[in-house]
Amino acid sequence: MRIICRQIVLLFSGFWGLAMGAFPSSVQIGGLFIRNTDQEYTAFRLAIFLHNTSPNASEAPFNLVPHVDNIETANSFAVTNAFCSQYSRGVFAIFGLYDKRSVHTLTSFCSALHISLITPSFPTEGESQFVLQLRPSLRGALLSLLDHYEWNCFVFLYDTDRGYSILQAIMEKAGQNGWHVSAICVENFNDVSYRQLLEELDRRQEKKFVIDCEIERLQNILEQIVSVGKHVKGYHYIIANLGFKDISLERFIHGGANVTGFQLVDFNTPMVTKLMDRWKKLDQREYPGSETPPKYTSALTYDGVLVMAETFRSLRRQKIDISRRGNAGDCLANPAAPWGQGIDMERTLKQVRIQGLTGNVQFDHYGRRVNYTMDVFELKSTGPRKVGYWNDMDKLVLIQDMPTLGNDTAAIENRTVVVTTIMESPYVMYKKNHEMFEGNDKYEGYCVDLASEIAKHIGIKYKIAIVPDGKYGARDADTKIWNGMVGELVYGKAEIAIAPLTITLVREEVIDFSKPFMSLGISIMIKKPQKSKPGVFSFLDPLAYEIWMCIVFAYIGVSVVLFLVSRFSPYEWHTEEPEDGKEGPSDQPPNEFGIFNSLWFSLGAFMQQGCDISPRSLSGRIVGGVWWFFTLIIISSYTANLAAFLTVERMVSPIESAEDLAKQTEIAYGTLDSGSTKEFFRRSKIAVYEKMWTYMRSAEPSVFTRTTAEGVARVRKSKGKFAFLLESTMNEYTEQRKPCDTMKVGGNLDSKGYGVATPKGSSLGNAVNLAVLKLNEQGLLDKLKNKWWYDKGECGSGGGDSKDKTSALSLSNVAGVFYILVGGLGLAMLVALIEFCYKSRAEAKRMKLTFSEATRNKARLSITGSVGENGRVLTPDCPKAVHTGTAIRQSSGLAVIASDLP
């Protein structure tokens, strides 16, 4: 009964079709869409809408009525249900997308039921009669490009999502030409696997890659290439994809790697331009994916609708009756009941030839695209640029690369360049009232001024961007990912880095540096020790204690020698003239240079004072002369050194060099956690630095600091128990800032420079380098350093390298001299008292007085100068003046001089 009813319905539909000209006014078409194809669905809807609403004066219009299903390709039962649902609705053709899991199910149903499938998905490897491939094959174009580049050794990365057609073609060509191809399937790779693979290939010096993957996987691979820094100059990537402009390649632009690919859609054609105008007006909420330009798969989807519409027009012109398709049919019938007009539909589809968004759309008898043209693009500094095209007839044709470097520069001048830097005094700092400013005006510092000068010389606009992680740039040993400002350049987030960024080998491998704008080295910062207090006898410091001991021995020795030569020389002996009324000269001629007088003479000469006696003999005068010469040199040297020692404050530093740090354990030391200083110690082969690195790496708690400011703060708080290793420029700057409690010790451990960095191969590199050289020749770099280091210093002049400061003398500097003066005066008073007592005792015996009486008489005489009670003047027996006279006799060969002494 059901069969009879179905036949009646079909018969009625046939008569209705004949009455309406054998062609329905509404054509049922199907649509099968898989996950992540929102933009393709938008293009599908837009194409149908434009067809149904566009006037056509030459032919009677007909509407396309879509029946759309979203399929989950992982579930073959769901795919079958979706197709059967389309078939049961009486669709004349199906537009659908598939992947490797659903392709065989869909193509099998199409072949069995004679329902044509128009698809923008990857071409199938076998021959499917009722499948029309909108996507052209890349095999011929890719092989032509490999021949052009003359690659004979490269890596081929692929997945199985699109089959093995390109892999087979490349391996066949490799066998014919002797190519060495490393084919690697990356279907099951994750991010870590990608990075490990890329590092391994880099160790094998693999620099050329062909990547044949769908857009989602392709984009992930490119991100991992950037993350390990393989997107720089020296690498070449060919992307086996028809949407070169659909791929995000901004970071590769800055990296400098050569990237080549294919572009199916020419956005300069009138048809594409017109559609783009309409595309931009779509409501993004109603048409998801319309916020971005249509991908090549969306363009193929649009062309697929045009192909179906043109096919129905052709069928109507041929008066082929397709109205008997109806809305009945069981796709699971056994045996299968194919659609009777399916052959006519499939034949007419393959005969269609139109101009679509992807150029000429034409098929061979296998349903594959023929007579198509695809453009060849390369990535330039200004973005993707067409360098040629490929088609079946002409093969690869390269066109002249008209744009020049000047145009690249002009393009740079017309946009704002991102300048990455780091908050580090005095290079980049916030102004005190930075909240009142916007953009670059919020910052000040050496690098801010330098960026302004470089921009003036190059003629660019720029925007300062502070690096988010606050690091200079180092590569993680495990993930191989660069951080800091180097990472900003490597991964295309910035175009210039103007900061205290040290030029190193590992950085130079992934970015370009200008000539150094500042020279420096690694130095040691410690907390400034307390000023050493001068000792009581600091006046002795100008001469070593050994010298003082030698002077004492010399003094004694000279006195003894003078005594001896005076004893042996006859010219030192003389007689004294007797006073009137006295007896003649004594039998013992006097000699003035006894041991005490010799000591007194030597002391007077040393103190550069005089003496009331002088040598008479030649030998004595020789001794006196050499002693005077000796004292002249010693006193002059002492005086010269004394001025410096008493007027200069000295600070005793516990550390003076890296060797001092390495051989002690009391003072900890460390570096910045991510930077060239840490890398210097890690890579150093010098024994001292290796020992220091071993300590720093294993020290607990960690001696590495996140920022320079943190390291300086740690030095200040450690009470002299932490030393920070950093660039000398920062060390000198910090020494000039309050609270003025840090200092640089020792010399620089190495010699290096700061440079302005640009991405590898960037067109800005040469211009920046020339600007730095020009600024250096003009002396502006030195002016900037003086401005931010010393002119704005807060600790006074004197230079960062000086540890001594000249100051006025304090009492502590000369206290010892006063002590000696007071001690000498006290000693003199004591000796005078002893002499007073001794003489009083002698006078008491001589005058037959008591000791107390003699003492009183002596005291009265000392105080008042008056006579005593007995009328006699009590005076001490002072030596009388010596008067020389004539020799009156000779005894034992000695000339005796008359004297007045008894």
UniProtKB/Swiss-Prot annotation:
Question: This protein's superkingdom?
Answer: Eukaryota
Lipid-bearing positions (S-palmitoyl cysteine) = 611, 837
Which reactions is this enzyme annotated as catalysing? Ca(2+)(in) = Ca(2+)(out); Na(+)(in) = Na(+)(out); Mg(2+)(in) = Mg(2+)(out)
Chain ranges inside the bilayer that never cross it: 593-608, 609-611
Membrane topology value: Multi-pass membrane protein
Query: InterPro entries given for it?
Result: ANF_lig-bd_rcpt, Glu/Gly-bd, Iono_Glu_rcpt_met, Ionotropic_Glu_rcpt, Iontro_rcpt_C, Peripla_BP_I
Question: Which cysteines bridge via disulfide bonds?
Answer: 84-331, 740-795
Tissues and organs where the protein is expressed, per its UniProt entry:
Detected in cerebellum.
The segments annotated as topological domain Extracellular are 22-544, 639-813
Q: How does it assemble?
A: Homotetramer or heterotetramer of pore-forming glutamate receptor subunits. Tetramers may be formed by the dimerization of dimers. Interacts with EPB41L1 via its C-terminus. Isoform 3 interacts with PICK1. Found in a complex with GRIA1, GRIA2, GRIA3, CNIH2, CNIH3, CACNG2, CACNG3, CACNG4, CACNG5, CACNG7 and CACNG8. Interacts with CACNG5 and PRKCG. Found in a complex with GRIA1, GRIA2, GRIA3, DLG4, CACNG8 and CNIH2.
Segment forming the signal sequence: 1-20
Recorded family membership: Belongs to the glutamate-gated ion channel (TC 1.A.10.1) family. GRIA4 subfamily.
Xref: CDD domains? PBP1_iGluR_AMPA_GluR4, PBP2_iGluR_AMPA_GluR4
State what protein this is by name. Glutamate receptor 4
The places in or outside the cell where this protein is found are: Cell membrane; Postsynaptic cell membrane; Cell projection, Dendrite
Sequence positions that bind L-glutamate? 500, 502, 507, 676-677, 727
Q: What else is known?
A: The postsynaptic actions of L-glutamate are mediated by a variety of receptors that are named according to their selective agonists. This receptor binds AMPA (quisqualate) > L-glutamate > kainate.
